[in-house]
Swiss-Prot record:
Name of the protein described by the UniProt record: Transcription elongation factor SPT5
InterPro entries documented for this protein: KOW, KOW_Spt5_1, KOW_Spt5_2, KOW_Spt5_3, KOW_Spt5_4, KOW_Spt5_5, NGN-domain, NGN_dom_sf
One record GO biological process: regulation of DNA-templated transcription elongation
Family recorded in the similarity comment: Belongs to the SPT5 family.
A GO cellular component annotation in the UniProt record: DSIF complex
GO MF term set: mRNA binding
Source species: Cryptococcus neoformans var. neoformans serotype D (strain JEC21 / ATCC MYA-565) (Filobasidiella neoformans)
């Protein structure tokens, strides 16, 4: 650029020049790239430092001045003016550029001084000027440490000297003045004063609502949930709080501003009495409702308390450990309640739905008993003879346990003397008590037991030893008139808690409380709180608390009353509750009521019950009768046993066993939970004493009146185990307790409730196998037994003679009773008998016999052969239609038929046959002959005989007028001389050709059939078909099958082994591998349905019990004496009485 151009160029304005320099300075102050190391940075810095700041900053101005100097002196003045302006601007730019240079540090060195800067003199001057105003503030002179230390020590010495010179009171006063204004910390200092917390008229009100007592907490919770559920709804409930107080039962308190909100909150909640209204609590009563007075519980070792919760609720306990009382835990000692019910019984009780939470009795811990029930591993032995069981420690029979203090009650404990005596190990009232152990029991004597005139003494406090007569009684203070000492005759007030009653030896007193209530006697000894007196009546010593005594006035009436009662007498506590006297203690009767609760009552509180021990009877769990004097035992629970000494309403049985100490050996049990210790015979047949069933009518002809309904003996069904098959209770198991018409009252097993169920909805339940069978009723074939029928016709059979085994051979063929072979026999089985039933069968004709017509022969109430009778199934000779024809004797269910002219086409099932071609008969070429093995029941009572040609051959001429009255023509009679071949025990000849009664021919008696197996003894006894599978090493007999619904042949190997005896030891499925006793080389695999037990026939035989109750089933005994079909067994160790077993329940042992 030339000088002319420079000169002609106008000078730049200061603002533009400043802006340009500012931009140039910003460019120079750019951030250094991190890749550029210290070398580049150092070079730049050194160059900047070597330059003069003025030259650097005014580089452009300097060049202009140099050029201006060369121009000449004409422009000198103008240049000087410009230089002055430029210098001012340069001075301003110097500071900006200097600051820019200092800010050119890297970001990572913002807080580190990593380079040294060389300041020039101008900067030093500037810094001096910057700190000029504070230059005198810091003393830079070095500090004299020694002088300062000496000064402080002298000051400390002056303080010590001054303290020594000052008086102590001055120091205290000065300290008080110094700290008088300091606020001492107080826990309640931040609390608002109580007067400011009192509610006012602007605060929410408190409303009182009456509720059901005991449900206060539940109702409060319901209100909480209701308010919370509606708080975000369109209509929230404006309730602020709700609470209840345990000390105010039956009320809750709700805080709200309006009563409408309270009504909305409680509306619809169960347990609130809205009829009482919603009441406003006054303002002055609101604050006391929220105050809680804390009670300090003072527990000391040896103190008596009572448990509040669990199965031990109400039990007395003693404090033994208070070391952890600060943690809210106290150690106590009490008598445990351990359930000693056998494990199997507990499982059965749970399986049938009975409650398992039965409260066991309180008894001391016995290691052997617990180990027997729960096993050895459940009990561990601890230190010093203690035991650990179920996480609890037991010492000397007592349970030692740590419980929370709220779990025990410390007030109103009032332990009785008998409760405390159990802690001493003796429950006898005459026992020697440890007085120190019961010293606290009588400490707090209630003032309600004190009356003016009582003698008392002070036993603790400053007035210990003072005694006198009570003059006035108040809740906490008692005024007495002192006797003896310095205050004799003066009235002295003493604390009520420090006094006790005082009695003198020889004084006559009466007991007010405890188990000896109303007893009276003379004081013979006084030791502290225990007074010993001699009873007026029992002449025995009684120990009672002094607080329970009072001076007696009159006992004459009591003496007369006590003579009315004796031990084990039954008394009535009220109109529905009975009990027995367990002990007579002076003026008190110890009673055990029907619910098992022991009570102590006075004779005036009970009434004696008429003695009915001779007539009292009940039914046990197996349906057997029990009476006074029988030895019974429980079937569940504690399995106690004892002798029956009284029975109440045939339900509650009172028993006595002197080995039991509780309640002096007396306990009570329900009759249906007992079983006889000694075996008993089957239940008696009450139909034998029913005159309606045994009524006999004189001879007479048949009647066309309708047959009367059978009188079913349904009492046989009582105590039968059944299962409900229909209705809402389907599947439930129970026991029939009563039969009323067509309904039965069934007591369910799982909850002991009684339901009324129709008999058609019940089925019998086998206790052993669990199988179900129809109930056996009168008038049906299953009641009579027979082939294919369930062998349950023993205990519950309506007709005990139906399908019975043939009579003994010595009795001959009998029709139908045990009076020899004659018809009629002493009005038994007479012909005709229109009203006879049961054993009075074999009648010709009989229009009213249990709805099945006259029968010849007949068994039980089945439809035997009938000639003639009423109804479609009656005996008809001949009959029109019905395919039944006249029947003589029975053909299956319809009987054998005398030729019927109107029968079905040949060869029809109703062909006339005389005698019948039985259901199990087979044709024989020789014609009719007696049966070799006659089936036992009516449906199969025909013998094995040759059939008379069936069809229309040899028909008896019929009169078609009235088919039911057409007589058999005289010219074609049923053979007169030939006897009717019938069943072994109940057979009768066919009536002969006469108008009267056909006698039984003496020359041709009713033939005696061989032994029948259809309804054998084990069927009557109720043995199942598979009984043999439960036993081994027994002797059995072979006979026809009696398994219900069996598809096997009737006889095993066509009857080849019938009547043979086998012995077996091996069981294969439902078969046994048996060896023939007559020929041991014969080994057969026989199904169990063909096996009968071999009966005992002489004494000295070893047998096993295969039937009866569970207490005797499976026992192996030796026969000793037989009487009436029952065997008495030889006594064995532990037998209380001889064992008598029915012969049908015995089976001989094979290999002894």
């Amino acid at each position: 650029m030339s000088d002319i151009e420079i000169k002609s160029s106008p000078p730049e304005s200061p603002a533009e020049e400043q802006e340009e320099r500012r931009l140039a300075g910003r460019k120079r102050a750019r951030a250094v790239d991190p890749d550029e190391e210290d070398d580049d940075t150092q070079v730049v810095n050194n160059q900047d430092e070597e330059k003069d700041p003025k030259e650097d900053d005014g580089e452009e101005g300097g060049n202009a001045q140099a050029e201006g100097a060369d121009e000449g002196e004409d422009d000198e003045d103008e240049d000087e003016d410009d230089d002055d302006d430029d210098e001012d601007e340069d001075d301003e730019d110097d500071d900006g550029e200097r600051r820019a240079k200092r800010r050119r540090k890297q970001k990572k060195f913002r807080f580190l001084d990593v380079e040294a800067e060389v300041d020039d003199e101008d900067e030093e001057e500037d810094e001096d000027n910057d700190y000029g105003d504070v230059a005198e503030f810091i003393d830079e002179a070095p500090e004299d440490v020694g002088a300062r230390d000496d000064h402080q020590h002298r000051r400390l010495n002056r303080v010590f000297g001054r303290n020594e010179e000052e008086d102590v009171h001055d120091i205290v006063q000065r300290l008080k003045e110094r700290h008088a204004g300091a606020a001492r910390y107080n826990g309640d200092s931040d609390a608002v004063p109580q007067r400011l917390l009192m509610p006012g008229v602007n605060d929410p009100s408190l409303w009182k609502v009456v509720v059901k007592s005991g449900r206060e907490h539940a109702i409060c919770a319901s209100i909480f949930r209701k308010v919370f559920a509606q708080q975000y709804s369109a209509n929230p409930i404006d309730v602020i709080s709700v609470f209840c107080r345990d000390s105010i039962p039956g009320m809750i308190f709700i805080e709200a501003r309006q009563s409408a909100s309270v009504s909305a909150a409680v509306n619809g909640i169960v347990g609130i009495f809205m009829s009482r209204g919603v009441n406003l609590v006054p303002i002055e009563e609101m604050a006391p409702l929220l105050k809680m007075k804390k009670k300090d519980v003072n527990l000391t070792p040896g103190m008596w308390v009572r448990m509040k919760r669990g199965k031990h609720a109400g039990d007395l306990a003693q404090v033994v450990d208070v070391d952890q009382i600060t943690s809210g835990v106290v150690g106590i000692k009490f008598i445990p309640r351990i359930d000693l019910t056998p494990r199997e019984k507990r499982k059965e009780r749970i399986a049938i739905g009975k409650p398992g939470g039965v409260r066991p009795p309180a008894r001391l811990f016995a290691y052997d008993d617990v180990r027997k029930i729960y096993g050895r591993q459940s009990v561990r032995q601890g230190a010093q003879g203690s035991y650990l069981f179920d996480n609890d420690e037991y010492v000397d029979g007592f349970c030692i346990k740590d419980v929370k203090i709220p779990a025990v009650a410390t007030e109103d404990v009032n332990p009785t003397l008998e409760e405390i005596s159990r802690f001493t190990g003796d429950d006898d009232s005459t026992a020697k008590f440890d007085l120190s152990a019961i010293a606290d029991a009588n400490k707090n004597l209630s003032t309600s037991l004190l009356f003016p005139g009582d003698k008392i003494e002070v036993y603790e406090g400053e007035q210990t030893g003072l005694y006198g007569i009570v003059e006035a009684v108040s809740p906490d203070v008692i005024a007495i008139k002192a006797e003896g000492g310095e205050v004799h005759g003066q009235t002295v007030e003493v604390p009520a808690r420090s006094v006790r009653k005082r009695f003198d030896v020889g004084e006559h007193v009466k007991v007010l409380g405890g188990k000896h209530t109303d007893a009276s006697g003379m004081v013979v000894e006084v030791k502290g709180d225990i007074v010993t007196l001699m009873s007026d009546l029992g002449e025995q010593e009684i120990k009672v608390f002094s607080k329970d005594l009072r001076k007696a006035a009159d006992t004459t009436n009591l003496t007369v009353t006590k003579g009315l009662y004796d031990v084990h007498d039954m008394v009535m506590l009220d109109s529905t509750t009975a009990g027995v006297v367990t002990k007579v203690e002076g003026g008190l009767l110890r009673i055990l009521d029907q619910n098992g609760a022991a009570k102590s009552v006075s004779p005036e509180q009970v009434s004696i019950r008429r003695d009915n021990k001779r007539f009292a009877v009940a039914t046990d769990s197996q349906g057997n009768d029990m009476k006074v004097g029988d030895n019974m035992k429980e079937t569940d629970g504690e399995m106690r046993q004892g002798e029956v000494f009284n029975i109440f309403r045939s339900i509650f049985v009172f028993l006595y066993n002197r080995e039991y100490t509780d309640n002096f050996g007396v306990f009570v049990a329900r009759a249906n939970s007992l079983i006889s210790v000694t075996p008993k015979s089957a239940v008696n047949d009450l139909t034998k004493i029913n005159p309606a069933l045994n009524q006999q009518l004189p001879y007479g002809g048949a009647s066309l009146m309708p047959a009367p309904t059978a009188n079913l003996n349904r009492n046989r069904l009582i105590n039968t185990l059944v299962v409900v098959t229909k209705g809402t209770s389907k599947g439930l198991i129970g026991v029939i307790k009563d039969v009323q018409g067509e309904n039965a009252r069934v007591e369910l097993k799982h909850n002991n409730k009684t339901l009324s169920v129709n008999l058609a909805s019940l089925k019998r339940k086998d206790q052993k196998t669990g199988a179900t069978f129809p109930l056996e009723m009168a008038g049906i074939a299953s009641a009579a037994g027979g082939y294919g029928a369930r062998p349950n016709a023993g205990q519950y059979d309506i007709n005990p003679y139906g399908g019975a085994t043939a009579m003994h051979p010595s009795m001959g063929g009998q029709t139908p009773a045990l009076m020899g072979g004659r018809t009629p026999a002493a009005r038994f089985g007479q012909t005709p008998n229109p009203y006879a039933a049961g054993v009075q069968n074999g009648k010709t004709p009989n229009p009213y016999a249990a709805g099945v017509g006259g029968k010849t022969p007949s068994a039980a109430n089945a439809s035997g052969g009938k000639t003639p009778a009423w109804g479609a199934s009656g005996g008809k000779t001949p009959a029109y239609g019905m395919a039944s024809g006249g029947k003589t004797p029975a053909y299956g269910m319809q009987g054998g038929k005398t030729p019927n002219a109107y029968a079905m086409a040949p060869p029809g099932p109703s062909g006339g046959r005389t005698p019948a071609y039985g259901a199990y008969g087979r044709p024989e070429a020789s014609g009719s002959r007696p049966s070799v093995m006659a089936p036992p029941s009516a449906p199969y009572s025909a013998p094995y005989s040759a059939p008379t040609p069936a069809g229309n051959g040899a028909p008896t001429p019929a009169i078609p007028g009235n088919p039911y009255t057409a007589p058999t023509p005289y010219g074609a009679p049923t053979p007169y001389a030939a006897p009717t071949p019938g069943m072994p025990s109940l057979s009768a000849p066919t009536p002969g050709p006469g108008a009267g009664i056909a006698p039984t021919p003496f020359g041709a008696p009713t033939p005696y059939g061989a032994q029948s197996y259809g309804a054998s003894a084990q069927q009557q006894r109720g043995l199942p078909w598979d009984w043999a599978l439960d036993f081994r090493n027994v002797i059995v007999e072979i006979g026809p099958s009696y398994r219900p619904g069996s598809r096997n042949p009737l006889h095993f190997k066509r009857g080849f082994f019938d009547g043979k005896r086998f012995g077996y030891n091996d069981i294969i499925g439902e078969n046994v591998r048996a060896i023939l006793l007559d020929d041991p080389s014969v080994v057969e695999e026989i199904p169990a349905e063909y096996l009968r037990p071999a009966k005992a026939d002489s004494q000295g035989q070893v047998v096993v019990v295969i039937g009866g109750g569970p207490e005797q089933k499976g026992q192996q005994r030796t026969t000793q004496y037989e009487n009436g079909g029952s065997w008495m067994m030889e006594l064995e160790g532990g037998d209380m009485a001889p064992l008598v077993v029915d012969g049908a329940d015995l089976c001989r042992i094979w290999k002894v």
